[in-house]
Amino acid sequence: LPDVDAVIVPIGGGGLISGVAFAIKSLRPEVKIYGVQAAGAPSMEHAFHDHKYETLDSAVTFADGIAVKTPGETTFDMVSQYVDEIVTVSEDEIAAAILALMENQKLVAEGAGATPVAAALFGKLPLAGKKTVCLISGGNIDVNILSRVITRGLVMSGRKTNLMIALEDKPGQL
């Protein structure tokens, strides 16, 4: 990909982004490397911005592939050296990205794998005019979670709604 300007990579413990960032920066240092974590499990994002290795009290996200409380020590050093920025995305943004990938690309991605697309779709990074790669790292999503994610994405996009009407429990109310 000689004309790529930016690469967005999901982050859990940091192994994938460390390898990707090192390889790309070794060949083309001008390419921007961006990492993405779920807002409910931002261990590397906190460490990156605080410039120190740290552990979270909890990591809560349906993107279980990146639900990591403590980033790797070695990977933290690599990320600090080779990654340009790390952002977080919400559960709703991840759900919308999964739905967009299904509808537009016919691709089933797990929550962790969809975080780069979520960051791009929701303007979390300065990507205007850049040729960007979103690394979609996995499709291992439970069908029950997928069903809830689809519903959530449809509600977010205004294509599905719930209507509840309170009725008295007596004949003739319907």
Indicate where each model-derived feature is located:
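Short amphipathic alpha-helix segments
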Residues: 170-174
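Active-site-adjacent helical/loop segments in soluble small-molecule enzymes
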Residues: 5, 72-130
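Glycine-rich phosphate/pyrophosphate-binding loop at beta-loop-alpha junctions
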Residues: 1-81, 122-168
